[in-house]
Amino acid sequence: MIPLSIRVPASTANVGPGFDSVGIALSLYLHVVVKEESDKWQVIHSFEDSIPTDDKNLIVSTACKVCPSLSPHIIEVTSNIPLTRGLGSSASAIVAGIELANQLGNLNLTTDQKVQIATNFEGHPDNVAASILGGTVIGALDGKNVSVVRIESKELGVISLIPNEELNTEESRSVLPDVFPFHEAVKASAISNVLVAALCQKKWEVVGEMMERDHFHEPFRLELVPLLPSIRKCAKEFGAYGTALSGAGPSIFILTPYEKRQEIAEQLARVFTSMKVCELEIDHRGITVNKEEHIGL
């Protein structure tokens, strides 16, 4: 068979007040290379031992749920997306699994169908839609119906501060309240609305201001990511637009003017020496599939 390669970008979600709705694709990638058929699924990887190497692997289990009749294959998986750091590692695996089923099962899924299926697996569209479409996405899940709008943000630079500590999404969600007062919801929703409008109109200073005024989740997660206020203060002093938790954390996501991203990243690295400071870009392509006779990662 002609080798098949799937590349899925990482993503950051929320961007402050866009909780479970706004996502941005990032220039870190999960690669899946599909090799020969086999009598059972085999996943070759160099991750920690807790990541399955059989049909229990998230990529494979997702693919088999989408297309139960798939023939088992050997696949090789590599990734520079940190696990359980709020950069969409599980979402990228789900998206890769859907595309694996699409390619091997000849499903001819549309982009909208991929987003719908991925959102059903993930429970919210922000990470998965960003990984599929690239760029910045704003999405909503209403029952089983998903609506997603994609916008370009090519003038922006991205910096991620990644701690050594992991933070499980379930743990980070457990600190969120079950009930949100109506007046707080109105205030939080208004801030989110302005964030989205500013993203669409490329008013980056307003974007930065709104992404630091979340009421939905960041106030409750501060105990899990105590460095956020000091990182936010320094980033602003160094010329960044704004700072927010990346997804559920613990990574921190910073938007900057594109031309200043390297300078700001270097300044932050000198201050926050316990964290890995990554100068990233927004990925504008989304998931890509390559069918060539010679594929290298």
Swiss-Prot record:
A GO molecular function held by the record: ATP binding
EC number: 2.7.1.39
Annotated signal peptide: none
Catalytic activity: L-homoserine + ATP = O-phospho-L-homoserine + ADP + H(+)
Full protein name: Homoserine kinase
Entry-linked PANTHER family: HOMOSERINE KINASE, HOMOSERINE/4-DIPHOSPHOCYTIDYL-2-C-METHYL-D-ERYTHRITOL KINASE
This protein's GO CC annotations: cytoplasm
Family of this protein: Belongs to the GHMP kinase family. Homoserine kinase subfamily.
Top-level enzyme category: transferase
Organism of this sequence: Bacillus cereus (strain AH187)
InterPro entries named among the record's database cross-references: GHMP_kinase_C_dom (IPR013750), GHMP_kinase_C_sf (IPR036554), GHMP_kinase_N_dom (IPR006204), GHMP_knse_ATP-bd_CS (IPR006203), Homoserine_kinase (IPR000870), Ribosomal_Su5_D2-typ_SF (IPR020568), Ribsml_uS5_D2-typ_fold_subgr (IPR014721)
PROSITE patterns named among the record's database cross-references: GHMP_KINASES_ATP
Localization per Swiss-Prot or TrEMBL: Cytoplasm
Keyword Glycosyltransferase: no
Protein's pathway: Amino-acid biosynthesis; L-threonine biosynthesis; L-threonine from L-aspartate: step 4/5
Coarse class of the protein's main subcellular location: cytoplasm
Residues reported in the UniProt entry to bind ATP: 82-92
Entry function: Catalyzes the ATP-dependent phosphorylation of L-homoserine to L-homoserine phosphate.
Record's keyword terms, sorted: Amino-acid biosynthesis, ATP-binding, Cytoplasm, Kinase, Nucleotide-binding, Threonine biosynthesis, Transferase
A GO BP annotation: threonine biosynthetic process
